[in-house]
């Protein structure tokens, strides 16, 4: 009897928690295609035959099937309602009791959010005035024409205190610094999708100052960051500075109001190899666009090879922020204790560019034993994507087999998952930047699998990850700013907070639920609503652990959504 009573109490408590945000129906708030299966998830209560779906013409549909699912993370009961393919474009009204919401069905449901996620990079450009940003126009900040060489980066020909110019580039995340590791990784990840879908990007207009030239807007945007990266290589030895930074994070102020001195710090093997990889790729991909960027491909190729030589001579030059003094530096570290994955990516990119045997040998020596989703701390999959893009390449079969092993394991739990998606079914799916590294990048891997097989078997699972991202999840949030009915309004992003505009920059992917809650003591009155892994998210400006934005996270969103949009 006691056990029964306890079970009843827990069940009632769970239902009360589920109803806290007032929505029982969880669905993709952005939209879906008339060629894909749709589903909604009902929190707590079996909808039975009460769920109604009204088509654009007024016809009433019922769910084709209803499946009970119990969350392995919270124990909460949910009901996955399969609606099947909704073949007519328009708005479908979903009702359950007094609750109603809309499912948007269109031929290109992800076009707007994909474009916004790429255009975000224009809005966060450093060193120029933003004049084509509409409400988000702002004066120039951080010209970075007066940057000091930190003593950690000093060399005989560039001693500490040397003034260099290092303009342009993108602000990295919620802060105003620029980091080579993350910048190079972000470009490399987006290049991977560009190589697969170049025709799509050739037609994509993001309304930026360069839109009238002969180069795709996507490549123009990458060039704005590449121009900065070129300045981060020491011209005397080929090593690359780890980052351009202030000693401490700026406050929540606009770029024009920032006053701290900025430095380039310590040359590192990881930054140098990431630089080498992305410059080698850029040399190839910009070759057809000499009219707009004369001489760039040759310059990038030469600088990539020089960087690689420096890395071979300095294989243990890892970033050690705790050793930096006069001044000490406390901004983002992007530290790494292994360069095996960076050597693999850089050697792969340089082999594709030059065909030199030494690079093939190095790629083979540093090749991964299994596929992992791409992150700035493990870039091996960027090398894998390069081998997959090259027909008949030396390591293509090995990389393909590793990818297929990963993808087949990723989809194993979908049939019983609470939100009908490969992502979000275990605690390890959640943490810092999880929506990028584990959702978007997992989906990107699934799309690559179909590309390799010439099928659409895995695309349906990638679409399910998009459903999760856009609202069919435990919090009911669409995790991209400016889209959906319920999206983040207070991201940890300095210009969005300081610009006196109510809405944040659109098209930003936030980090997502993070049970680590590393910022819980810094929330200044805000609080996480739950310790449950998939509910541990708070839409508060102070939440850098769950609500920050970053270029690498948006790069994963661009890579994923542009691929989806290109194949709709």
Which residues are covered by each model-predicted region?
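Short, compositionally biased P/S/T/A/G/V-rich stretches that sit at domain boundaries
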Residues: 20-30
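Carboxylate/His-rich catalytic cores and anion/metal-binding grooves
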Residues: 216-237
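Aromatic (Trp/Tyr) and acidic
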Residues: 29-97, 101, 107, 123-188, ...
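Solenoid-like repeat scaffolds
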Residues: 367-373
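Hydrophobic h-region of N-terminal signal peptides that target proteins for export
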Residues: 9-18
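Positively charged n-region of N-terminal signal peptides that target proteins for export
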Residues: 1-4
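Acidic, glycine-anchored loop motifs typical of Ca2+
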Residues: 210, 214
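Proline-centered turn/helix-capping motifs that create local helix->coil transitions or kinks
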Residues: 233-242, 315-321, 355, 415-416
